[in-house]
């Protein structure tokens, strides 16, 4: 309870088997843009936030500007998501990689580094 009060534990969740809820396809979407204004980013972030299929969203260093992890039932569902995204936001390049097999997935964090 102290960990919750101290903000260490943010929330409690149930871990759901994605196959049991028809989300068998994981897609990693690398996005590059030539626009970096706050206004553009706000529109992009809003578009991504409106898509429940996007389960993670990161701003990256290196060649990729943003990385999304998307979970969908099939490739057609991803294609529909992709079309909705590019309809709302001007993107320079979108590269999608489909996960063939999940080797490791954990939400447990290494607590050895905690103060």
Where does each model-flagged region fall?
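A compositional/biophysical signature of low hydrophobicity enriched in polar/charged and small residues
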Residues: 1-115
